[in-house]
A protein has these predicted regions:
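Conserved beta-strand/loop positions that form the S-adenosyl-L-methionine
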Residues: 70-72
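Short conserved AdoMet
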Residues: 63, 85, 153
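Residue-level signal for inorganic ion chemistry
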Residues: 29, 81, 195
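S-adenosylmethionine
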Residues: 88-91, 95-200
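Conserved active-site region of classical short-chain dehydrogenase/reductase
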Residues: 56, 79, 142
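Class I SAM-dependent transferase core
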Residues: 1-64, 68, 98-115
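Conserved SAM-binding loop of SAM-dependent methyltransferases across substrates and taxa
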Residues: 74-87
Length: 200
């Protein structure tokens, strides 16, 4: 009931069924992570629950129905978004076969019909320009901006989850930091970089 405890200390209100599904995801993630090192094998169950809670706190910022999670790894935040809002179409982009196997298992085990899984590098994937791009632990922010520039990204909403406040000055991109509620609850630096193209 680790996620329930974290939610109790926050303003996040979610359905009991969704809460149960998040706990189920945590259990499966813990089991697989011990042998497959999906996130970091050294992370405790409590720390994995904190990662999930961090993703829960992203939800109020996602108004679009289409979400593209870049380099999703073990499904953070994409799986969490899929569990919490069945009306959103969530695309997970991940090149690693080991992690793809886990994502497919989660999708089948939890019946996530709103999930699309793509085994591709972000640099090669064809994207829906109307979807919100989200990234967490994908790469460092300046490198991310470089990749966005190379791909000529047209998405109007891009959110990068970060563990520190980062200031980026770019001639083509506006980057604004927003603190996450997870920062207060976890007592760790947590926030989002809201990235948008500057119209010339």
């Amino acid at each position: 009931m680790l996620i329930k405890k974290l939610l109790a200390n926050s303003s996040q209100e979610i359905d009991k069924i969704i809460e149960t599904n998040l706990e189920k995801y945590l259990e499966i993630l813990c089991k697989w992570n011990k042998t497959r090192n999906l996130v970091s094998r050294n992370l405790s169950k409590v720390e994995l629950a904190e990662h999930i809670f961090d993703c829960i706190c992203l939800m109020p910022f996602l108004n679009n129905k289409s979400i593209i999670d870049i380099g999703t790894g073990a499904g953070l935040p994409g799986i969490i978004i899929s569990i919490m809002d069945e009306n959103k179409e969530v695309v997970l982009v991940e090149p690693n076969q080991k992690k793809i196997s886990f994502l497919l298992h989660i999708q089948a085990e939890m019946g996530l019909k709103n999930l699309v899984i793509k085994k591709e590098k972000f640099e090669n994937v064809v994207l829906n320009s109307e979807g919100v791009l989200v990234a967490r632990a994908f790469t460092e922010p300046n490198k991310f901006i470089e990749i966005l520039e190379q791909k000529n990204i047209e998405n109007s909403e891009i959110i990068m989850m970060v563990s520190e406040e980062i200031k980026i000055i770019s001639p083509n991109w506006r980057v604004v930091y927003t603190a996450s509620e997870a920062e207060k609850v976890l007592e760790k630096k947590r926030g989002f970089l809201n990235i948008s193209r500057i119209e010339n």
